[in-house]
């Protein structure tokens, strides 16, 4: 019996334009996995498509077919063993040839493939592996032409993309370039074995009181002969300590056993408890010899989506281990247009940044990819819950038999691959495809429950979302929650705020409402909303190489903003709210102020609504990240540099947060007449699971003088309810008497100042914010850490620190009021480094 061995084929590859027959056409590939754009860049054949207008000069790559080749030695194959060629992912139309013979054809980027090549490698010595990648751009157009009866409609990119199981954003999106990659985008290897564990999974049943858990462990086994002489030894461990061991025989090709765990340690989202991960290991043995061994980590937890009738309609919120959790977080797009650029370390940094920002959920958006294992592993370990879309986005997908078969395989493969991750708490059928159905007037009769009839309508994709995918989820992960689409709610119009989840784009897109009323526009769960902002100057310096192009409306900057109508939308929100500027650095800052304020108004109000019978169950901003250096809705740019909005969201999502706001007065529709009076409200939100006693203070500070215009209001011994909202007080501002002033709120618990909020008169453009008397004093310094004290004579709006690589500030986008010194810790800034630059409104 030969034990399992594998040989990764990462070196020795070459590639060429498939149509180039010249002898010097072959170019070297530095390493695999890779995609063709990287390999062309490595050979000096392509300029970086992320710089300037280079995306345009890279378009020729999109229209070519490519061939990759590797000459390898046949590995040693013990008697009774077979040899398999394994691809974890091929992008996308791939024909694989071994020594000139076709052994595999693939047309789905999201599938892995295994080919038994034992007979093909009968001859010892060298063998030639060749992969032809046909042009996906042209193949998609051919497929669309072959199916004229289908209604090819959608948002973003060429609608021919709907015919191909490839990352949809490769066709371009309203935040990303058109870069049609091709290549071996995941690992390729040779596996030699007589027996192999092909799958290992667990099913966890947790007692309602959490006193015990029953874990069923199962392993699927593949053998090259009779399998009944093998046994499987399962081991359950926690933090390296074995807590259970069981031996099972094979029943067919599956071995199963159970473990009972008393007083189990549970997996929790960050901020609610530990992210405990157990390890299940299985060893496949025959006659005391080990043939193969596999381990996976998993968590013990329950995850529910609570949808029940209430006074607001029908709830939509998450309950983990019996605890209701407000899901503040963000949507995730692929972190690079060239996917093989992304390292496990980069994934880890993204997820750790979310936890630093008090975010507990990330939504893997349906126009990208089922993410890499290291992404989900980071989410498991850091405690970020995953909302997982299936890979369908913004379109009316076709359903001819071959593509349905491919989609079913794709769904089952990725469900199996990812089912052990406790962070994944929901599977969702698509992104905005029901909105395409609504806007295009496609047939959707929710009362019709016959899946076969859906295939005959002009919206056949319903069959995928309401039949094929839920069936696959039920088959592979029976305990998982499935939701047909995002947004979607019981078959009602997707903008219905009373049910399901909602994408609220009437700030920025749509009716372009004032961001100050964002919280009034939400629904039961706000799974998309956003506001664009420029990235920091250091990021713009990276892709704008000509100094003459560094002005706000330059061609290069417009080219790197893919959102339709971005000029007028950015201009609208700037002109409505701020004194505008043409200097690029100031302009960047102003767009960032607008984004930070927009996110704050949305999250602050929606989190408050959580305490009103779970009126709002969560808010996932669009978007966390970028796939290239660009101007977009991201709150952290391509280089992991947070924009001010990141810090604004972080403060609002702290375990304890205080909120104060005056009622909105729409100056644009009242001839800019000021209101005579304004009501204001003060409240505290808590995600803590126990009641706490706090002290609350509200001050009224003149913007002009920095002096108090009224006595402070102080409430001692305030009982703050757990996991909800505590309304503290309300009042009225008399504008005939009171000069323009801020409402400055603070919260103390056990003598510690834990939260602040400052409400300002709107809009900022009417305020004189000069001569603020800001002082920034360094009060402590070590080789790698500095603490700054911030104070001001008059209220300061949105103090933003420069973002430098490998330097982290504990807070930014800060409002400062007199008599309330704040402290910011800077890590990674050395003694010899120049101090961080900063900006504030009116500077």
Curated annotation (Swiss-Prot):
Its EC number is 3.2.1.25. Optimum pH is 6. Active from pH 5 to 8. It comes from Emericella nidulans (strain FGSC A4 / ATCC 38163 / CBS 112.46 / NRRL 194 / M139) (Aspergillus nidulans). Exoglycosidase that cleaves the single beta-linked mannose residue from the non-reducing end of beta-mannosidic oligosaccharides of various complexity and length. Prefers mannobiose over mannotriose and has no activity against polymeric mannan. Is also severely restricted by galactosyl substitutions at the +1 subsite. Releases the terminal mannose residue from mannobiose, mannotriose and galactosyl-mannotriose (GM3), but not from galactosyl-mannobiose (GM2) or di-galactosyl-mannopentaose (G2M5). Gene3D superfamilies: Galactose-binding domain-like, Glycosidases, Immunoglobulins. The active site is at 432 (proton donor). GO terms for biological process: glycoprotein catabolic process; mannan catabolic process. It comes from the Eukaryota. Pathway: Glycan metabolism; N-glycan degradation. Transmembrane segments: none annotated. Belongs to the glycosyl hydrolase 2 family. Beta-mannosidase B subfamily. This is Beta-mannosidase B. SUPFAM superfamilies: (Trans)glycosidases, beta-Galactosidase/glucuronidase domain, Galactose-binding domain-like. Optimum temperature is 37 degrees Celsius (at pH 6). In contrast to clade A beta-mannosidases, which are likely secreted, clade B proteins appear to be intracellular. The keyword Lipoprotein does not apply. Keywords: Carbohydrate metabolism, Glycosidase, Hydrolase, Polysaccharide degradation. InterPro entries: Beta-gal/glucu_dom_sf (IPR036156), Beta-mannosidase-like_N2 (IPR054593), Beta-mannosidase_GH2 (IPR050887), Galactose-bd-like_sf (IPR008979), Glyco_hydro_2_Ig-like (IPR006102), Glycoside_hydrolase_SF (IPR017853), Ig-like_fold (IPR013783), Mannosidase_ig (IPR041447). It catalyses: Hydrolysis of terminal, non-reducing beta-D-mannose residues in beta-D-mannosides. One of its GO terms (molecular function) is beta-mannosidase activity.
């Amino acid at each position: 019996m030969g034990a399992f061995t594998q040989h990764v084929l990462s070196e020795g590859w070459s590639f060429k334009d498939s149509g180039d027959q010249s002898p010097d056409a072959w170019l070297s590939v530095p390493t695999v996995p890779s995609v063709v754009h990287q390999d062309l860049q490595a050979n000096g054949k392509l300029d970086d498509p992320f710089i300037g207008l280079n995306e345009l000069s890279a378009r020729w790559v999109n229209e070519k077919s490519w061939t990759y080749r590797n000459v390898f030695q046949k590995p040693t194959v013990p008697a009774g063993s077979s040899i398999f060629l394994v691809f974890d992912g091929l992008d996308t139309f791939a024909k694989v040839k071994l020594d000139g013979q076709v052994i595999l054809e693939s047309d789905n980027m999201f599938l892995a493939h295994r080919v038994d090549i034992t007979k093909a490698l009968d001859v010892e010595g060298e063998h030639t592996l060749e992969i032809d990648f046909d042009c996906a751009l042209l193949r998609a157009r051919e497929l669309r032409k072959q199916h004229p009866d289908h209604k090819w409609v959608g948002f973003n990119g060429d609608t021919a993309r709907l015919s191909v199981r490839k990352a949809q954003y490769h066709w371009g999106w309203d935040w990303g370039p058109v870069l049609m990659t091709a290549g071996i985008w995941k690992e390729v290897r040779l596996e030699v074995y007589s027996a192999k564990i092909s799958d290992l999974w667990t099913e966890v049943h947790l007692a309602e009181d959490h006193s015990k858990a029953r874990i069923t462990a199962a392993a699927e086994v593949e053998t090259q002969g009779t399998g009944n002489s093998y046994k499987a030894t399962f081991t359950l461990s926690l933090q390296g300590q074995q807590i259970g061991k069981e031996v099972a025989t094979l029943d067919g090709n599956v071995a199963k056993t159970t473990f009972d765990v008393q007083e189990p340690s549970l997996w929790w989202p960050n901020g609610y408890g530990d992210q405990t991960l157990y390890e299940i290991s299985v060893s496949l043995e025959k006659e005391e010899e080990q043939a193969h061994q596999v381990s996976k980590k998993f968590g013990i937890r329950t995850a529910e989506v609570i949808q029940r009738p209430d006074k607001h309609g029908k709830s939509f919120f998450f309950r983990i281990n019996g605890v209701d959790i407000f899901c503040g977080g963000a949507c995730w797009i692929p972190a690079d247009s060239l996917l093989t650029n992304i390292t496990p370390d980069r994934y880890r940094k993204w997820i750790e940044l979310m936890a630093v920002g008090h975010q507990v959920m990330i939504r893997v958006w349906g126009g990208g990819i089922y993410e890499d294992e290291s992404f989900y592993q980071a989410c498991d370990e850091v405690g970020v819950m995953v909302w997982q879309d299936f890979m369908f986005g913004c379109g009316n997908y076709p359903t001819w038999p071959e593509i349905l078969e491919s989609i079913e395989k794709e769904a089952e493969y990725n469900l199996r691959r990812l089912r052990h991750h406790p962070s994944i708490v929901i599977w969702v059928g698509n992104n905005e495809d029901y909105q395409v159905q609504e806007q295009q007037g496609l047939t959707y009769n929710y009362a019709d429950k016959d899946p076969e009839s859906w295939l005959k309508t002009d919206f056949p994709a319903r069959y995928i979302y309401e039949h094929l995918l839920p069936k696959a989820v039920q088959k592979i992960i029976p305990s998982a929650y499935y939701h047909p689409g995002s947004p979607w709610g019981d078959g009602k119009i997707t903008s219905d705020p009373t049910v399901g989840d909602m994408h609220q784009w009437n700030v920025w897109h749509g009716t372009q409402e004032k961001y100050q009323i964002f919280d009034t526009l939400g629904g039961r769960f706000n799974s998309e909303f956003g506001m664009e902002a420029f990235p920091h100057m250091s990021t713009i310096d990276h892709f704008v190489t000509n100094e003459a192009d560094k002005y706000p409306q330059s061609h290069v900057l417009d080219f790197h903003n893919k959102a339709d109508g971005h000029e007028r939308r950015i201009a609208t929100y700037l002109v409505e709210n701020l004194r505008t500027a043409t200097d690029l650095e100031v302009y960047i800052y102003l767009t960032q102020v607008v984004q930070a304020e927009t996110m704050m108004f949305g999250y602050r109000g929606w989190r408050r609504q959580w305490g009103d019978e779970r009126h709002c169950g969560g808010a996932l901003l669009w978007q966390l990240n970028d796939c290239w250096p660009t101007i977009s809705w991201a709150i952290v740019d391509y280089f992991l540099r947070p924009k001010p909005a990141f810090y604004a969201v972080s403060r609002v999502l702290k375990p304890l947060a205080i909120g104060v706001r005056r009622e909105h007065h729409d100056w644009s529709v009242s001839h800019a007449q000021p209101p005579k009076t304004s009501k204001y409200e003060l409240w505290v939100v808590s995600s803590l699971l126990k009641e706490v006693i706090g002290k609350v203070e509200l001050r009224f500070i003149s913007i002009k003088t920095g002096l108090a215009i009224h006595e402070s209001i102080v409430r001692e011994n305030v009982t703050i309810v757990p996991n909800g909202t505590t309304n503290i007080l309300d009042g009225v501002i008399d504008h005939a008497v009171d000069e323009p002033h801020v409402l400055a709120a603070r919260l103390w618990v056990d003598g510690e100042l834990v939260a602040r909020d400052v409400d300002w008169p709107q809009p900022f453009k009417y305020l004189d914010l000069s001569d603020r008397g800001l002082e920034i004093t360094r009060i402590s310094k070590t080789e790698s850490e500095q603490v700054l004290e911030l104070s001001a004579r008059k209220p300061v709006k949105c103090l933003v620190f420069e973002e430098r690589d490998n330097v982290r500030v504990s807070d930014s986008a800060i409002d400062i009021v007199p008599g309330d010194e704040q402290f910011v810790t800077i890590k990674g800034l050395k003694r010899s480094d120049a101090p961080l630059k900063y900006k504030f409104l009116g500077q």
